[in-house]
Amino acid sequence: IARKNIMAIEYEVTPMNYSGRIEFMSKLQADVENHTRKTNPIVDYGPFGRKLDSDELRADGDILYYEGTTQNSHLSVACGSSHGIWKDGAEQKNLEWKSSVGELEAEVVTGIQAEKGETVVLEKMICYTTSLDLGKEERKSFVLAELERAQEDGMQKLEKWQKEYMAKFWEAADVEIKGNE
């Protein structure tokens, strides 16, 4: 996979009847738990509830970062996200990012002026890795470096690489469906 640890999301906002400040808020929610019968009626097994302990949660500039460890297997996950704002085809570099960190949630917020009909784009890069792939000392630096690389590559390159990868994948895939003809 071209960049198996990276996911990219692009949000476009175009004010139709408004000129003024547009705010973007991005959250990293660490308050996750296994589904129960209440939250998913097809689930009928345990263990229920929160089984991932938070080891680190932080927000710095446009970066969110989290590490957590499962209670029973002690597998760990590290993830983060980075953000860029684009207007008129140019990345907006001198934005002020405000951040807050709670016990199980962190967020970053920024804003930018936009005119009616002007499109503003938020590019959000997300990176995940686990203790199955990297040791504890390597995970944080890996996530932060991958996020930086993804921001440098940008959405268009990442999308191009993913399309090329998927085209090669499906070219080599040998899928036959029989029955119900």
Predicted segments with their positions:
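Acidic/polar, glycine-enriched structural segments that form the non-catalytic walls/loops
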Residues: 1-181
